């Protein structure tokens, strides 16, 4: 099971590796509500999205998966799937997941501060702020392929993604608790 990162499209995170993995594994890749061009819905909450993932695994995999890999935000889903114990996974792998948690007030402040800065990058493929866009271009010129690879993983312009989906995802991730010592 592959779970993409914050505000990311599944194809940009995993499109290149799915064909390689399919040679040896049955591959499932999550498409979060609000982040795919084929749907016109919005991301609800981490728990609502987790319930949908669990329901799919229960119905289509008998409640058992061999492994789940979560990139960034996807790691929070791996943690939630393990903690809730509604499905069984043999291995949970976190990739660059910070698992940050915050109070509702702190989460709202972070969301309200960061989203206006990064949402234009998600929607239009570039920052609205000339300062941030120039910093990105300078960093890209200095670090070349690394920055280009990161931006490709993040995805190109996605005008179908709403600000509300981004807010819901970012805020909900911060306020959804994960217990300590998940088995």
Set out the residue ranges of the language-model regions:
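Helix-loop "lid/cap" segments that line or gate small-molecule binding pockets
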Residues: 126-146, 168-174
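Flexible "cap/lid" loop of the alpha/beta hydrolase fold
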Residues: 83, 89-121
